[in-house]
Structures are given as C-alpha cells and as structure tokens.
C-alpha cells in the first residue's frame, strides 16, 4: 500500500489519545509507539484538539468512533482491517484500516460494504474451490510435519482472522488461513490444529461474524 499523509489519517498515538486507551487487536512487533507529544501536536494541527486539551466538535466525532471501537463487545481483525459493531445503528460497523506506515483511517460502514471491502482487499476469498478441498479434514501429524518442513515458497496467499470477545470472561481467538501446494488450510495456533477446508467455509464464517444469516457456524463446529 502507498503511504498516506492526509489529515483524515491518524497515527496510533493520535487514536489512543482520542480514545483514552489502547486499541484492541492492534499490535506491533516490538513495542507500541509512544510519541504522544508529536501526536498531540498533530491533533491540534488537524483542529481536533485545542491547546487546552479539549476536543473540538470535529474531534468529538472522531473520538466517539475510536471509543466505540475500544468499548465494543467484540473486535474483529481481518489482516489489516479492524471492525467493531457500531452501537448506535443496526448493521453498521466501525472500520479501522491500517496502512503499511502504521497510519490508520476510521469510519462507519454498513455490513454489506464491510463484506465487499474484505473480499476486494483479500482475493484469497474469491478462490475457486478445488475438487480436493474438504469441508473439514483433520491433518494427521505426519502430513503436518511434512508441510511444516517444506519451503516457505510453497505457501501462497495468507489471511489472519482474530476475534476478541469482551462479554463475560474475555476470549481471544486466532485463525490462520493459507494456501499451500494448491490446497487451502486453516490453522488454530492456540490449539496446534490444522484442517484442510474449502473457501466457502471461510466465507461463511466471516459473514456470520457480521450477522449475515447462515445455516451453521462451520468454524466453531470444527473447533469442538
């Protein structure tokens, strides 16, 4: 992705200032950025915060979205797209988009737009189903070891889905979806479990996350 420098893009520090807290599911390889003085100056320049640390009207609107994302009952990450239900409107979601320079953009979108944005961003979801793809096929230990020992060049398109549910006891789930040797796999890192699947299962799972009607939750069934 190209670098972005428009005023409707924000650094991680700017968003944490506006939200008053860290952003769920937004992680960094080494440590969280912490240049808050520069972030505050940027917010003042964008006329979102005053010199006296007060939110302007425009700043209040952006801060409301950030705080909605932080306080949502569930956060969903699909690679560099972060979602949370918008509590004020049914079927609306907050979308936090992350760019390669760790710039972010935040907005509200309908769940239909959310789905098509995901599909357009990650062509893996338009994969043509293969005759050797399964609904769910457990990979035995020997096959898994052979796959793990193969060159990284055998791995094609990759998608990560991460879910953080705040209801009751907080629960966090991570799924790695990837192509290898012309097959599609889903890996549950926390359970060290790998399944051969077809893309329809993955698409159904994602659509269920956004409240689309489906027959059953395939991914949850596979984890049982």
UniProtKB/Swiss-Prot annotation:
Cross-referenced Pfam families: DUF5081
Coiled coil: none
Swiss-Prot/TrEMBL keywords: Secreted, Virulence
UniProt keyword Secreted, yes or no: yes
InterPro entries (alphabetical): EsaE
Recorded GO CC terms: extracellular region
Compartmental location: Secreted
Domain of life, per lineage: Bacteria
Assembly: Interacts with EssD. Interacts with EssG. Interacts with EssC.
Biological role stated in the UniProt entry: Component of the type VII secretion system (Ess). Plays a role in Esx protein secretion. Plays an essential role in the processing and secretion of EssD.
UniProt-recorded name of the protein: Type VII secretion system protein EsaE
The organism of origin for this protein: Staphylococcus aureus (strain NCTC 8325 / PS 47)
